[in-house]
């Protein structure tokens, strides 16, 4: 562990107090470590990450999602330290940083390889492609009426949905927007994709969990022009009814550092019993 990168979300740590604390904690363990810092992913890309042994992300889950797309093809593992709101992906809380870093240097951790998702569509003569860790969401614009979406799975017609949109998520993303729209919680190491209609007009419209090798094609009725595509809730692009959106499992994987098998503890504490306004959580 000789080269460590730290990507800090400056809106969460504007005075760099947490960043300096992390640097000091690392130097207390090994003074010879070379530490490079990045603010909001500036300067941190695939080429840069190849020189790093680990990327420490200081922020929340959104910072991890942003970092993940920035270093898309990189195999450098990410360690998330939560100074955000929820911190489901960012497993390490700030009060346990020193213990976590000691485990990191002793090699007492595992690396989880998380599936990513990819969407493609044609724009003129160009093929547009976007990858994400959580989800791809196709939804109507603010001024738009309820829209109709025709869904094909492996080129076979599956169903038509009329509603606000459609969420296609990885198992990692199942606890994000998908869960808010009534989709299922899926263990993050399951090799699947999940399709969830958003607020469909038809009560019988439900999520479907698919083999990750599935190719999902979605077309919008041509009379709807005000539609958008969202990747991880952070990248937005406008699409129209003449385009077919294709979604499938990405060839890239995101490597996340984990110190214990505490998935169900984290799920219970941060998702199930963290629902605001519900004393008993979401279940």
Swiss-Prot record:
Localization per Swiss-Prot or TrEMBL: Cytoplasm
Cofactors named for this entry: a divalent metal cation
The organism's place on the tree of life at top rank: Bacteria
Record EC number: 2.7.1.23
Gene: nadK
UniProt entry keywords in alphabetical sequence: ATP-binding, Cytoplasm, Kinase, NAD, NADP, Nucleotide-binding, Transferase
Coiled-coil segments on the chain, per record: none
Family: Belongs to the NAD kinase family.
Pfam family, one: NAD_kinase_C
Protein name: NAD kinase
């Amino acid at each position: 562990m000789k080269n460590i990168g730290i990507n800090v979300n400056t809106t969460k740590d504007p005075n760099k107090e947490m960043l300096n604390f992390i640097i000091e904690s690392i130097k207390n363990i090994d003074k010879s470590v070379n530490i490079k810092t990045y603010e909001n992913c500036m300067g941190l890309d695939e080429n840069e990450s190849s020189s790093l042994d680990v990327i420490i992300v200081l922020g929340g889950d959104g910072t991890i999602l942003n970092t993940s797309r920035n270093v898309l093809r990189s195999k450098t593992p990410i360690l998330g330290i939560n100074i955000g709101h929820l911190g489901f992906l960012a497993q390490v809380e700030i009060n346990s940083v020193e213990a976590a870093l000691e485990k990191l240097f002793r090699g007492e951790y595992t690396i989880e390889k998380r599936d990513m998702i990819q969407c493609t569509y044609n724009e003129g003569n160009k093929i547009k492609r976007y990858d994400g860790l959580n989800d791809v969401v196709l939804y109507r614009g603010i001024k738009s009426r309820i829209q109709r979406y025709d869904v094909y799975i492996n080129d076979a017609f599956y169903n038509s949905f009329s509603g606000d949109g459609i969420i296609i998520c990885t198992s990692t993303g199942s606890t994000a927007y998908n869960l808010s729209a009534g989709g299922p919680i899926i263990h993050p190491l399951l090799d699947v994709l999940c399709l969830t209609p958003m607020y469909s007009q038809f009560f019988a419209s439900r999520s479907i969990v698919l083999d990750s090798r599935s190719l999902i094609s979605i077309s919008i009725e041509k009379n709807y022009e005000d539609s958008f595509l969202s990747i991880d809730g952070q990248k937005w692009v406008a699409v129209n009814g003449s385009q077919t959106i294709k979604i499938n499992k990405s060839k890239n994987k995101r490597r996340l550092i984990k110190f214990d098998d505490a998935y169900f503890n984290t799920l219970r504490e941060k998702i199930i019993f963290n629902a605001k306004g519900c004393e008993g959580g979401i279940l």
